[in-house]
Amino acid sequence: MSSEVKTFSKFRRYFFPIHKSEFPKFIPLLLLAFFVGFNYSLLKTTKDSLVLAGSRAGAEVIPFLKVWGIVPGAVIITMIYGWMSCRYSRGFVFCALVGGFLSFFALFACVIYPMGDALHLNGLAAKLQTILPRGARGFVVMVQYWSYSLYYVMSELWSSVVLSTLFWGIANHITSVREAGRFYALINVGLNVSSIVAGEISLWLGKHTLIPSSMAVDAWHGVLLNITLLIVAAGGLILYLYRKLDHLTEEAPVLGDGLVSEMSVAQLKQEKKRPKAKAKSLLSVLFRSRYLMGIAVVVLAYNLAIHLLEVVWKEQVCQIYSSRVEFNSYMSRITAFTGIVSALAGVFAAGQSIRRWGWTVGALITPLTMLITGGLFFGAIYAVKGDAMILGGFLGFSPLVLTAWLGGVQNVFSRAIKFTYFDQTKEMAFIPLEDDEKDYGKAAIDGVISRVGKSGGSLVYQALLIIFSSVADCMNAITIVLLLALGGWIWVVAWLGKEYSVRTAALGKARAAEEPSLQDEDESRVSSPISEPEAREEVVTTL
């Protein structure tokens, strides 16, 4: 053990601050993150291509899907998660939910999509068009192509359920405060690399065929079948890696190998005997805690802001690409670029800057980045309205291409910062909490609150579309709401930073009191990588 607590070399401390004794826990966790993120990236580009490309409503369908599809789905899946958590083990819940998602995606690609218009509600859509105003055409398209809408909803829920709740749930469960500052930065790099790989593979599949299939009814279906094959294969590896981690956490205290060095056998038994909260108490746990409410506001603001920006950008892209294959190729390239920027930020900036300047600085980077890049994107749109296109003409771009390009840049940087700074600081914010607050508060925030944020933006869009009939005519109101969301986000992060410092310091003192021998061995070497600067002396870590 003495060799394991030696400080790292400067190079390794910067790029790979993981001890050899931590490899059996860290490597499966990193691979699990990669494959969960790989599926997330494939599903993200596929759902957009399926629903948006060639649609007469374009990106206007997104606000209606967020409210009438994703919110009910998120509430239902959160209730299912709470109900299952009351009755079954953590491992069974994970495998059952992941297996359910994989089964649906396979069924859609092999059965539902080939049936085409036989399943779609064309007659009902024609009647709705005569009743509803022109601004509600997104709702009509959502109802008419209900199977595509269902695929969109399930793909979105993969993010909130499998990535945010299940994966980060197991990560928080097996990772200590001392490990989190070192583990989470590298795990986020793994997620970013998965975006690069998924984006390039999806782009390649738009031009080539991995496995030819006689089942394909059109060119897009051939691409969809190959993407689904990769999703299911990655899903199998996800289940295998989870079982490996689950077994590891059960056996490590008995074997005495130090893999779960900060949780004693008695603590593990207490965790297993801890009474489960009822499904309906998920939200009540959230509302009882000001700290959890602060995290919820941050998540709410991010999802509101990114949705407001993304719909405007995708509306520009829909006007350029009408083919699903071409649209998918474009979005795949954006996904790959996002992964590249995220990986660079994760390796060279995120982990080190949070350890050096603290949680608050890391948490403020996301809203400030969105404020700057969003300002450039919206500024270009306003310039187009004012015919101020000297730059576009000089570069040989049409006004539409220029604004779409700036929107893509904005999306790449917003997503990249989200996958590095936002996700990392959000997950770190849960660590000082008690087990009940951590598990059920996180499930409520990731499963419901994140969707409420997007739905808030969607409700704004729906109201504005009914009044103005198009996204372009809603820009002034969208700008005002966006500025309010970003301003409130920055204020709450400043408050949360103070609370996080206090709670982390208290947790460090409690851990030091419970584990005096570990404290005596380590405290002379290093300080916590994740507490605020003024609290760093309170939390001991192994770096």
UniProtKB/Swiss-Prot annotation:
Compartments, record wording: Cell membrane
Compositionally biased spans, kind Basic and acidic residues:
533-543
Please tell me one Gene Ontology term that the record gives under cellular component: plasma membrane
Which GO molecular function, any one, fits this protein according to its record? ATP binding
Where, by residue number, does the polypeptide cross the bilayer? 23-43, 61-81, 92-112, 150-170, 185-205, 222-242, 292-312, 334-354, 361-381, 389-409, 452-472, 477-497
Query: How is this protein positioned relative to the membrane?
Result: Multi-pass membrane protein
Q: Give the protein family.
A: Belongs to the ADP/ATP translocase tlc family.
State what protein this is by name: ADP,ATP carrier protein 2
Organism, as annotated: Chlamydia muridarum (strain MoPn / Nigg)
